[in-house]
Amino acid sequence: MDHSSNRFGNNGVESILPNYKLGKTLGIGSFGKVKIAEHVVTGHKVAIKILNRRKIKNMEMEEKVRREIKILRLFMHPHIIRQYEVIETTSDIYVVMEYVKSGELFDYIVEKGRLQEDEARNFFQQIISGVEYCHRNMVVHRDLKPENLLLDSRCNIKIADFGLSNVMRDGHFLKTSCGSPNYAAPEVISGKLYAGPEVDVWSCGVILYALLCGTLPFDDENIPNLFKKIKGGIYTLPSHLSSEARDLIPRMLIVDPVKRITIPEIRQHRWFQTHLPRYLAVSPPDTVEQAKKINEEIVQEVVNMGFDRNQVLESLRNRTQNDATVTYYLLLDNRFRVPSGYLESEFQETTDSGSNPMRTPEAGASPVGHWIPAHVDHYGLGARSQVPVDRKWALGLQSHAHPREIMNEVLKALQELNVCWKKIGHYNMKCRWVPGLADGQNTMVNNQLHFRDESSIIEDDCAMTSPTVIKFELQLYKAREEKYLLDIQRVNGPQFLFLDLCAAFLTELRVI
């Protein structure tokens, strides 16, 4: 018998959650329940996930649960579900979340069928704003679908379920195949490496299609057939779509991730900009900057409820979870709901400061041309860690040239440097360099310098065992505007030798 599950309905839970009055069960999942509750001090409703540790462990879902908790703890956006606090016991984890009463976008589409373009656009604008916020804070969702998009009482989008999300690391690429196959990008189901944001763009394209058409672009009961359609980009556009929608959807559903439209480009698209609310017309404020903004009126309300003012202010500045900060954020969120939005003041400041309202983050030049070594420490998400702010520089080499032209020049440079390579994707290679070997000892096998489907590498047993062998990866992907970025990631080998190789590589390149 699961004794912890039996405690869900008795006074045991209330003793653990003295600040909440538990109500009815909203849903039952694989390893717990979701209950509606009332925050005693403020009277505001919340949803509380009660997760059973034993069930989570048996299903090997500890990492998924922990990941979602860490990510949501730091996020503050009107279209991302809010997490107020997490209370842990030896048997259960209690996650206090924002309560949304109107269910999933999936059910909304099933009930209403295809939506009018204005309504679909309103949903889509909110989704893109939330996804952009994730990406700016180095998180890729990887499982965007209507089932994970909730609706509040005013039918505003709330992005949820970050259990499959990954924190993006500069110079690193993801390979895990996850998410729902109907919404997954070709590179994901193919098991190829991907940078991250481009897979969310694909999923958003599928969602937009579903909003406007009432059906999925890629659907088949037979999974191999479904994968074939996705990998081939095989779908049809109904005739009822406007010309602008017919232009945007195919650009989001381009099979080649390098050529796929980006979030900043979606923002600039005419269909997206039509009837765009002012609070969504600018990029969202940085998470760290948000934490610095404290609403004095709300603080005073919290103090009037019996909390110490200095403790409230210190806890807010440090992003500490306690009764005072939970009370503050519940009051804040319920005071400023969309459409005014509790973030609108930050958006307004950005606009009034004279910046372009459609400004997107731009990467400045690095101190060494356009190249910076991609060996960067990982940003952790500890209890009081901060999500990194926007980058003011870019990793890798940037170019306006055509991707094939760039890769041909890259291969020429690698051959000149006597580097072996193996193609692992359309624009992705594993490389190996052993300093000091003569050309004949580190032989290349591709005499025709075209980026073809076949791999081009010869493994040398002696070279592979050399203590000075340098292993690295190259990947080209699309950056802002019409630029392409070549990322260089050291996998193994001495750091300074790798930097020497990169310097030599730069001098060999002809078009970048």
Curated annotation (Swiss-Prot):
Q: Where is this region: PPI?
A: 392-512
Q: Which residues carry this modification: Phosphoserine?
A: S165
- Describe activity control: Inactivated by the begomovirus AL2 protein or the curtovirus L2 protein. Activated by phosphorylation at Thr-176 by GRIK1/SNAK2 and GRIK2/SNAK1. Inhibited by trehalose-6-phosphate.
What the record says about disrupting the gene is: Increased seed abortion.
Identify the enzyme class: transferase
The chain's coiled-coil residues are none
Q: Name one GO molecular function term.
A: ATP binding
UniProt domain UBA: residue ranges: 293-333
Database matches in InterPro entries: KA1/Ssp2_C (IPR028375), KA1_dom (IPR001772), Kinase-like_dom_sf (IPR011009), Prot_kinase_dom (IPR000719), Protein_kinase_ATP_BS (IPR017441), Ser/Thr_kinase_AS (IPR008271), UBA (IPR015940), UBA-like_sf (IPR009060)
Please write the reaction equations for the catalytic activity of this protein.
Answer: L-seryl-[protein] + ATP = O-phospho-L-seryl-[protein] + ADP + H(+); L-threonyl-[protein] + ATP = O-phospho-L-threonyl-[protein] + ADP + H(+)
Entries under Pfam families matching the protein: KA1, Pkinase, UBA
Question: Quick check: keyword Iron-sulfur in the entry?
Answer: no
Q: Where is this region: Auto-inhibitory domain (AID)?
A: 291-391
Location, primary (coarse class): plastid
- Segments spanning the bilayer are none
Q: Which CDD domains match?
A: AMPKA_C (cd12122), STKc_AMPK_alpha (cd14079), UBA_SnRK1_plant (cd14335)
Free-text note on domains in this protein's UniProt record: The regulatory domain (RD) contains the auto-inhibitory domain (AID) that inhibits kinase activity of the protein kinase domain (KD). The PPI motif mediates the interaction with the ABI (abscisic acid-insensitive) phosphatases.
Protein's name in the database: SNF1-related protein kinase catalytic subunit alpha KIN11
